[in-house]
């Protein structure tokens, strides 16, 4: 029997403002969509925290035995500077500044995004679709919304009529806004805008002559509005009604509000059952900002190349630090805080290392520690809206168990010892996604040794003029992602 049948999860639903018992549309299966990055610059540490939060949620669902289709998109067109309808596409602007093609910018920062998430041990999603790969689907949604009488064309652009939509729906329900208040608090453009109402948002934008990224449509050569892509990709891969939609708190309005409106306009029903939002990461009590210099790149954590840090920290320590706060809570990053987290992380890893060496524990016919209650406490923490700080507190109770068992102050049966070890491993490594650095270092050392041995074999083959064998070793290593570089000084490799 899968674990999920014995556990009841409560999720804080941003739409209702309450914790609700999670009940997937199809038993045993979960459809989850998370808004991914706009790839025009390096992701910052706050982005990593958001994606890490949903990584843990994804991991926990998998641990419980759910079959999860996890979609996380890449925004590579349509995201206008300052998140408005008029202006320059963020990627196109970056391309002009660096005198590159837009897709060169997309490729560069998509690779950076993947490298960062890999370093922080995030699992890849089931599908990672791009906005540019779904232009046809977006055009079809625009047609549907126009046919429903809620979208309108104006000078080659198409807009969503929020006033018309609000006649039979509630635009603003996710963010707690009222359409009348929004309209009253916006300036009259005196006919200067293509929109009927200032709050109307773009479904399709006509491209200016100098705009690089453009596609043909029934209305104009142009590009889709930012909000449209997520509706198109989520419905394509998860259907018009799915379980969970997540993202950063900053996306609640207007992005997610507009997604709800688009979905309801197309189908007449709520597109998503549970809306989830992860909170911000600040630096020394202030918002992270590149323009003010109050910013740390994810790579600066483990390189130590930041003026805000006194030393380098492993990505796993940074992950542990961020999971010590609940995903809906604001978290302030400071040097002192991550130093304290590092100490806790090593205590936890040391305890698990001891626990794996079961020979040092004397087992008994009885267990004086309530392992079953402790185990359920771990599940209860995650079942309560994925409360990682409470889970970590229970894991440190497990650290205490390890210490008293080593000192023979408590007793444990062989069966309970195995259950204890299995549970600690499951929550620390599988659910929280932490990595044992000593094990990783040992594995890296072994890999280095194997590659160096193959380099020497290749050198010997070349000395013997067996160039076919030399090339075979080089090509097979390259197929595994290991590139050899020959120079006068010898051969080195990179991964």
From Swiss-Prot:
It holds the Pfam family CysS_C. It is found in: Cytoplasm. InterPro entries: Cys-tRNA-ligase (IPR015803), Cys-tRNA-synt_Ia_DALR (IPR015273), Cys-tRNA/MSH_ligase (IPR024909), CysS_C (IPR056411), Rossmann-like_a/b/a_fold (IPR014729), tRNA-synt_1_cat_dom (IPR032678), tRNAsynth_Ia_anticodon-bd (IPR009080). A motif ('HIGH' region) lies at residues 37-47. Its cofactor is Zn(2+). Keywords: Aminoacyl-tRNA synthetase, ATP-binding, Cytoplasm, Ligase, Metal-binding, Nucleotide-binding, Protein biosynthesis, Zinc. One of its GO terms (cellular component) is cytosol. Zn(2+) binds at residues 35, 230, 255, 259. One of its GO terms (molecular function) is ATP binding. GO terms for biological process: cysteinyl-tRNA aminoacylation. ATP binds at residue 290. Binds 1 zinc ion per subunit. Its main location: cytoplasm. It comes from the Bacteria. Its EC number is 6.1.1.16. A motif ('KMSKS' region) lies at residues 287-291. It catalyses: tRNA(Cys) + L-cysteine + ATP = L-cysteinyl-tRNA(Cys) + AMP + diphosphate. PANTHER family: CYSTEINE--TRNA LIGASE, CYTOPLASMIC (PTHR10890:SF3), CYSTEINYL-TRNA SYNTHETASE (PTHR10890). Monomer. Belongs to the class-I aminoacyl-tRNA synthetase family. This is Cysteine--tRNA ligase. It comes from Flavobacterium psychrophilum (strain ATCC 49511 / DSM 21280 / CIP 103535 / JIP02/86). The gene is cysS.
